[in-house]
């Protein structure tokens, strides 16, 4: 994440870049300077997850009540100081960064293997030095923050770009995160989440102007430096030989800087003393050894340019560029936002550098009447760049649609929704269209559906952090799921990627239209799901799976746009059909909230996975019931005798099921409120682990329920619903002591490790190992198809 080696360099060689600041005091200055405007901090939420998750237990599936309280305290600290928070989450992985994403996932796999080795050898949780965030943490953090009344957005491209863009365009007090890319973007000040003291609101501010002063560079040079050092777009190996040439000729080597630090100093020295001499006179490829990586390099530099910005390293003065006075024209005659334009010398067309064609939010802007901000805010005193504003009150198109009733927020303005090819060709006119397409063949996106209204609704829910994966499926047909705490050596439990795949396949059928199972043509979704044995060299190519909905599968227009009360029943029918549980509708309707969604999930799990036992079911139900009577403090102080590796995997498996419910619920038009399947309402990892250990030892149900008679009736009712639904699928749930009996489980089962891809299309009892893990016989194929 960020620029290679820059974090260590700042800490060891240039500590003066880091200034201790009090955010409360900065907010007071901001209020005095901009009367009537609320000081706002834009938060890179993905950088903050580790900071927010302070619970001692992390391997058991997550301490969700404790985590929710931590988020509430975090928000309250800023609210009491009169500071508004805007949260951004990663919404998708950009094609150009897939390799980096894969590299991190494979590294995480190795870390998870060490975690399970430790658990099985020590029967304890590893120390914080091996900490791995619980599955689903990012997804459920979005919903937690929305529940706490916070504005929460999910990105349509790389989140750090949208964070930096929002911070610049809305004159934010600063950015809160932990990513050196925020030192590179020319945006508002950057605060460290890792150094934040919540009680005093004191933290470290990293000043890009002081960084430039130390390196002898200008702020506009930082994107060039970042690409030469290596980042998520330009691999570190791309300019390795160039960096060492710079180092070999660098005369001011510092002993305390270390090798990486001196490389940064040497490259900066080369930029300031050599490249600056020919800037604007020579093309950048004439000054740097770009070779076949020219397109990737340009993409890397351009990725740091926020709306309205341009790089002097991508501008060629002699050719076709219009003057500064000619650059500022209006994109929309009704809009007051000015957008930089340039003339393409080949096509004689005006092309916008960076625009946001679908801005839907009107945000009060606080503009400094003076060109410079306060010195303490660490902004470039030489910068006279105006912050683009969008003040058109009529630029928000109204869309009549079914929306999540829990949502009240609008789209953020000033965000580029796609990588802007025109911007690259505009800022570098001799850079041809063919070069752009060579840069990344998947940039030119073809959506999976053509209905613009449906895509608008999906996009809105995506940006508002109300849905999960739906827009990705509709827009690009490509989704991903990060690592889960799964034991690659445990052959008795299938990976969550396979267990929930049939549900996802039915969602694909719902979202991508009608087609028949087994057809050679039709939509295919690329799944980048991490599971044991998956090298992630290519995505799994997964086809939709037909489902049966009573009365026929309703269209997305009906599910998402209809206001008719009767449609709510159709939404629920469709949700149950995605889990193949239509026959259990009546029983599930009788289950009270918030246990209904959990009950649905348990039925699906026990039908799918033969190796789940009666003891497992007792533990799942008992923890859900006992959770209703526990305070956060009681859950925090719960002590476990030891840690069981199988229980660790079961906890993660259930939480991944809850994230699958988020996907299905949003795809079906929100038949259930999100509170039905938020983990802090239905699951606690440590409590489940306790019940699992007790159930494994053969404790009576009364003991599992802590002698609470009122819970006993609910327990037996929930158990009856699950067992009855499973029996309809010929799945008999028995205790582990009966596993050797020839009459256990489902007829025709293939023994341990058996799970079903679907119960109605001839896949019953298919071994999960054949679906892609273990030996991976299909690896000889370029992409795997399902």
Swiss-Prot record:
Residues 750-771 have a biased composition (Polar residues). Induction: Up-regulated in differentiating adipocytes (at protein level). Residues 1-561 are annotated as: Mediates transactivation of PPARG. SUPFAM superfamilies: PIN domain-like. It is found in: Nucleus. One of its GO terms (biological process) is peroxisome proliferator activated receptor signaling pathway. The keyword S-adenosyl-L-methionine does not apply. Its main location: nucleus. One of its GO terms (cellular component) is nucleus. Residues 371-413, 738-786 are annotated as: Disordered. Ubiquitously expressed (at protein level). InterPro entries: Coact_PPARg (IPR026784), PIN-like_dom_sf (IPR029060). The keyword 4Fe-4S does not apply. It comes from the Eukaryota. Keywords: Activator, Differentiation, Nucleus, Transcription, Transcription regulation. Belongs to the constitutive coactivator of PPAR-gamma family. Functions as a transactivator of PPARG and ESR1. Functions in adipogenesis through PPARG activation. Interacts with ESR1 and RXRA. Interacts with PPARG; in a ligand-independent manner. This is Constitutive coactivator of peroxisome proliferator-activated receptor gamma. It comes from Mus musculus (Mouse).
């Amino acid at each position: 994440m960020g620029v290679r080696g820059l974090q260590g360099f700042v800490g060891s060689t240039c500590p003066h870049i880091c200034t201790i600041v009090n955010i409360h005091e900065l907010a007071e200055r901001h209020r005095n300077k901009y009367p009537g405007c609320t000081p706002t901090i834009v938060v890179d939420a993905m950088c903050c997850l580790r900071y927010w998750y302070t619970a001692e237990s992390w391997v058991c599936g997550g301490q969700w009540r404790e985590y929710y309280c931590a988020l509430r305290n975090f928000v309250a600290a800023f609210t009491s100081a009169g500071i508004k928070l805007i949260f951004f989450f990663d919404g998708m992985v950009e094609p150009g960064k897939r390799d980096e994403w894969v590299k991190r996932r494979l590294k995480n796999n190795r870390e998870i293997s060490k975690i399970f080795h430790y658990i099985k050898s020590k029967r304890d949780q590893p120390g914080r030095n091996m900490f791995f965030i619980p599955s689903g943490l990012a997804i459920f953090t979005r919903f937690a923050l929305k529940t706490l009344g916070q504005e929460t957005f999910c990105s349509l491209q790389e989140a750090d770009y949208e964070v930096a863009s929002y911070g610049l365009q809305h004159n934010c007090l600063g950015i809160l995160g932990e990513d050196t890319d925020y030192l590179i973007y020319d945006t508002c000040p950057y605060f460290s989440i890792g150094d934040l003291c919540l009680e005093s609101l004191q933290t470290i501010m990293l000043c890009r102007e002081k960084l430039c002063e130390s390196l002898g560079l200008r702020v506009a040079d930082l994107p060039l430096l970042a690409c030469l050092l290596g980042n998520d777009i330009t691999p570190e190996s791309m300019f390795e030989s160039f960096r060492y040439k710079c180092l070999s000729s660098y005369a001011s080597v510092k002993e305390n800087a270390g090798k990486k630090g001196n490389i940064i100093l040497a490259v900066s020295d080369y930029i300031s003393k050599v490249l600056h001499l020919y800037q604007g006179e020579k093309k950048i490829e004439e000054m740097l050894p770009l070779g076949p990586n020219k397109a990737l390099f340009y993409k890397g530099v351009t990725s740091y340019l926020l709306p309205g910005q341009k790089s002097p390293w991508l501008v060629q003065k002699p050719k076709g560029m219009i003057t500064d006075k000619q650059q500022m024209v209006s994109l929309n005659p009704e809009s007051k936002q000015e957008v930089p334009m340039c003339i393409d010398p080949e096509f004689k067309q005006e092309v916008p550098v960076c625009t946001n064609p679908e801005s839907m939010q009107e945000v009060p802007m606080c503009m400094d009447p003076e060109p410079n901000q306060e010195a303490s805010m660490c902004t470039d005193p030489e910068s006279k760049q105006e912050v683009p504003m969008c003040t058109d009150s009529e630029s928000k198109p109204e869309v009549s649609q079914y929306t999540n009733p829990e949502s009240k927020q609008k789209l953020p303005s000033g965000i580029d929704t796609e990588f802007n090819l025109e911007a690259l060709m505009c800022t570098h006119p001799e850079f041809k269209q063919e070069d752009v397409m060579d840069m990344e063949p998947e940039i030119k996106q073809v959506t999976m559906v053509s209905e613009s209204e449906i895509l608008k609704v999906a996009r809105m829910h995506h940006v508002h952090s109300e849905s999960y994966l739906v827009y990705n499926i509709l827009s690009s047909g490509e989704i991903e799921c990060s690592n889960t705490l799964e034991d690659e050596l445990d052959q008795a439990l299938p990976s969550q990627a396979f267990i929930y795949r049939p549900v996802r396949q039915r969602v694909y059928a719902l979202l991508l239209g009608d087609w028949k199972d087994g057809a050679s043509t039709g939509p295919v979704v690329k799944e980048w799901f991490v599971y044991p044995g998956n090298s992630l060299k290519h995505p799994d190519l997964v086809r939709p799976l037909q489902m049966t909905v009573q009365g026929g599968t309703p269209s997305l227009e009906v599910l998402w746009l209809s206001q008719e009360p009767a449609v709510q029943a159709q939404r629920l029918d469709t949700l149950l059909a995605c889990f193949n549980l239509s026959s259990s509708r009546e029983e599930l309707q009788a289950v009270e909230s918030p246990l209904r969604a959990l009950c649905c999930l348990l039925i699906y799990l026990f039908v799918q996975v033969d190796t789940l036992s009666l003891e497992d079911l007792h533990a799942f139900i008992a923890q859900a019931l006992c959770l209703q009577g526990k305070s956060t403090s009681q859950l925090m102080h719960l002590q476990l005798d030891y840690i069981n590796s199988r229980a660790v995997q079961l906890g993660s498996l259930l939480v991944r099921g809850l994230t699958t419910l988020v996907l299905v619920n949003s795809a079906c038009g929100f038949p259930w409120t999100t509170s039905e399947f938020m983990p802090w309402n239905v699951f606690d990892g440590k409590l489940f682990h306790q019940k699992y250990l007790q159930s494994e030892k053969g404790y009576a149900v009364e003991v599992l329920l802590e002698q609470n008679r009122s819970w006993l009736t609910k327990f037996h009712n929930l158990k009856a619903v699950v067992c009855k639904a499973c029996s309809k699928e010929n799945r008999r749930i028995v205790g582990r002591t009966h596993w050797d009996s020839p009459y256990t489980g489902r007829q025709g089962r293939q023994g341990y490790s058996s799970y079903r891809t679907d119960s109605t299309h001839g896949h019953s009892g298919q071994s999960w190992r054949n679906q892609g893990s273990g030996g991976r016989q299909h690896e000889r194929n370029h992409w795997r198809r399902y």
